[in-house]
Amino acid sequence: LIATTPAFGGRDDSFRQAFVAARLGPLDAGADMATLAQQAIPAIIGPAASAEMRQLAIAAMGRIDETAFRQIVSCLVTFNRRADQHRISQPCCLIAGSHDTNSPARVMAKMADGLANATFHIVDQAGHLVNSECPETVNAILTAFFNRVENKQDG
């Protein structure tokens, strides 16, 4: 589970409303996805992100269909699996960026504590796009995790 939480935002609807307004407000005001991406991506990445990664993420977000983006944002704010989290018994690897404000490390750590078989990692200087910002680090964490899981099954 990379840069995610068991539910969107807190239990306060004001966060959801602010999240939607920040993402859809510029589109409602006439901006296109490319313009929104230039604002949104720098706000969610950490200092570890390279200039090239930043530009690639901006370009990728800029190509998202606006209607699809609106639907994604509307759906995202309804996500809530807190009540089901305890049902996950298989091994889980949780990875957070230390600078991620969308899926904060403290929230992911709490989620890991609520899972029966979880490991939790924080990637220093990474933001919400942790796997793109620090791919070698994330790949090393995942490789070690998969090797541990495989060795337990073989043993």
Provide a role label for each language-model segment:
Residues 1-29, 37-38:
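Flexible "cap/lid" loop of the alpha/beta hydrolase fold
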Residues 17, 38, 42, 54-55, ...:
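Short, surface-exposed alpha-helical segments at coil->helix boundaries
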Residues 39, 54-83:
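Hydrophobic, aromatic-rich cap/lid helix
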Residues 40, 73-76, 111, 138, ...:
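Hydrophobic "lid"/C-terminal helical patch
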Residues 63, 79, 101-102, 129-133:
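A short, basic/aromatic alpha-helical/loop segment that forms part
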Residues 74, 90, 104-113:
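Short alpha-helix in the alpha/beta-hydrolase fold that links the catalytic acid
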Residues 88, 94-96, 100:
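Short beta-strand/loop motif that positions the catalytic acidic residue
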Residues 117-155:
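Catalytic active-site module of serine/aspartate enzymes centered on a nucleophile-bearing elbow/loop
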